[in-house]
Regions:
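Conserved phosphate-binding/catalytic region of the ribokinase-like
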Residues: 2-28, 188, 217-318
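Cofactor-binding loop segments of dinucleotide-utilizing enzymes, especially the Rossmann-like FAD-
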Residues: 33, 83-87, 108, 120-122, ...
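Short glycine/proline- and charge-enriched loop/turn segments
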Residues: 45-54, 202-204, 252-253
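Substrate-binding N-lobe of the ribokinase-like
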Residues: 48-115, 317-318
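Short beta-strand scaffold segments in enzyme catalytic cores
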Residues: 70, 115-119, 127, 241-244
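Conserved phosphate-binding/catalytic loop of the ribokinase/pfkB sugar-kinase fold
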Residues: 106-108, 118-155
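Conserved beta-alpha-beta core of the PfkB/ribokinase-like small-molecule kinase fold
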Residues: 155-219, 223, 241-242
Length: 318
């Protein structure tokens, strides 16, 4: 894998993507993180000052960008992943490609690939510590090289595990690309970004509270739509369900009851399946139901991207 993509290769890629755009539906571009996940199975999440032994250690491919791209691909979308890895990132690319993700935009940098230390307790709840690595090495030049291959009608999915998000928002919006933002992990600086450029927000209850200074789901949705009236909002509440809201409609979908084994990829699975259901023409209410079902399947399995179901596993009784 080369650290720099040649100009001729970029032209060839752009031409190939233009042909695909003409023959397929919406193209999804995920600009995000690629991590190696080190997953420690524990009786409980470690407390400050406590030392405990893990029951098991697993290594998996992850990162919010990787997981959302995997979820979209497993749902049947045409998805491109842009991100940065180190010389140790080969396994991430191989795994993503096996899922059906186009990784031609991923480049290599002189640093370690990002990783995450994930604690998973006996109830399937998790706690995550991130190391950014190459995920924090995005430049304006790389951002331009990625976005130059996309145009109006394409959909961009962003999270907050990479740097350069402000630049990406501005440049993607100028190209007419529809922007989806999952502001996770949340940082106060997010509120200073030009978030009016976002078409669809995916937030959980904690992120929603941080974004709006509200605590109740109804109040969070009201405030988000007041602040960003041209956007739609999906608010996930874990085992309590999820809301969809825009300025014309609002729907709630209860979560499906399952025995949670690992919740690591729950949110990313929900995001990917909601977007693909939307692409297939389902109503917002149906998209919530489809995403909830996919997320329920994912949390009933160990691992992150490997736990994401394929579309055929869902029961379409809507």
């Amino acid at each position: 894998m080369k650290s720099q993509r040649m100009k001729g290769q970029e032209t060839e890629l752009s031409k190939a993507q233009s042909q695909e755009s003409a023959s397929l539906g919406t193209r999804f571009l995920v600009m995000g993180s690629l991590n190696y996940d080190y997953i420690y199975s524990l009786d409980h999440i470690v407390e400050p000052g406590e030392t405990i032994a893990s029951v098991k250690l697993d290594k998996a491919c992850g990162g919010k960008g990787f997981n959302q791209a995997a979820a979209l691909a497993k749902a049947g979308a045409k998805v491109y992943l842009a991100g940065l890895v180190g010389s140790d990132g080969g396994e991430l690319l191989e795994t993503a490609q096996e899922f059906g993700v186009d990784c031609r935009l991923v480049q290599e940098r002189d640093n370690r690939t990002g990783h995450a230390i994930i604690q998973v307790d006996k109830n399937g709840q998790n706690s995550i510590v991130l190391y950014g690595g190459t995920n924090r090495m995005w430049t304006a030049e790389y951002i331009d090289s990625v976005l130059d291959s996309f145009e109006k009608g394409d959909v961009l999915i962003l999270q907050n595990e990479i740097n350069g998000i402000e630049d990406i928002l501005e440049k993607a919006y100028a190209r007419g690309i529809s922007i989806v933002l999952n502001p996770s992990p949340f940082e106060a600086c997010i509120l200073s970004w030009q978030l009016e450029k976002v078409s669809l927000f995916f937030i959980n209850e904690v992120e929603g509270s941080q974004m709006t200074q509200k605590s109740e789901p109804k109040d969070i949705l009201d405030q988000m739509l007041f602040q960003y009236p041209d956007a739609a909002v999906v608010l996930t509440l874990g085992e309590k369900g999820a809301w969809y809201a825009d300025r014309e409609e609002r729907y709630f979908c209860p979560a499906q009851k399952v025995q949670a084994v690992d919740t690591t990829a729950a949110g990313d699975t929900f995001t990917g399946y909601f977007l693909m259901a939307q692409e297939k023409g389902f109503s917002a209410e149906q998209c919530l139901s489809i995403a909830a079902q996919a997320s329920a399947i994912a949390v009933s399995r160990k691992g992150a991207s490997v736990s994401v179901p394929v579309w055929a596993e869902l029961q379409m009784d809507l």
